[in-house]
Amino acid sequence: MNRKHFLRILSAALLPALLSACAAQRPELYAMRNGGSHQPFYFTDRYGELAFREFYDWAGQFVGDRAVVERDGKWGYIDRSGETVVPFRYDWAGSFGQYGFDEEVAMVKTGMDRDRIPLYTPCPTALIDRDG
């Protein structure tokens, strides 16, 4: 068997495995909003179908199995089924893995003036793990 045929057979055998590995790393749910800034956020699958019937004032994309969401001025985290896994008790929250932290840690703030920039507001700040 010459080298050309060997490479064809090898790429035919490995390509499906590589493509499925790449597809598995893509997010399965997406935070979406229709229209202007006053419309609620919701989550869809990759085909645009509504994933669950929860709507949020703001929503971030999933990082692993958690997404940061805001409802009625408080921030918390949901899992991929839409269940609240970290209660809506923070005045601001970042996504897991944001601001240079690894994907197991997120920054949250309490006692924050809502008219200020969250990252630079002097107020009680904490790092939480995926369970809050």
Residue positions per predicted region:
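Residue-level detector of conserved, function-critical positions
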Residues: 23-132
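Bacterial N-terminal signal peptides
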Residues: 11-20
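Homeobox/homeodomain signature
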Residues: 8-9, 118
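N-terminal export leaders
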Residues: 3-7
